[in-house]
Amino acid sequence: MQQAADDAEAMLEAAKFACRVRRRLGLSQAEFAQRIGVSVETIRNWEQGKRCPTGAAKALLKVLDKAPEAALAALTLTLAIAR
């Protein structure tokens, strides 16, 4: 029972964190999704607590929180090269 409560709390915290990072950057969900290379549905799922960012996505959100300009510049370059 406690594990389920802890999991729900972790999902809520992840949702708040993802939303806070995006809003601090001043981006809509669509703009944020495009900038970080994921679907709008992924962003919505994170922010609604339906899914929790893991792995590289979780690390990226942490970097965007601490050094947004550098992270966005690197992402812009990476996405441009990929195209």
What are these regions (language model features)?
Residues A10-A14, L25, P53:
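Residue-level marker of regulatory loop/turn positions in helix-turn-helix DNA-binding domains and
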Residues G55-A73:
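DNA major-groove recognition helix of helix-turn-helix/homeodomain DNA-binding modules
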Residues A18-E31:
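Short basic helix-loop element that most often maps to the first helix and adjoining turn
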Residues M1-E13, E69-R83:
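N-terminal flexible/basic segments that precede or flank functional cores
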Residues A14-F17, V21, A56:
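N-terminal positioning helix adjacent to the helix-turn-helix/winged-helix DNA-binding module
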Residues V38-P53:
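Recognition helix of helix-turn-helix/homeodomain-like DNA-binding domains
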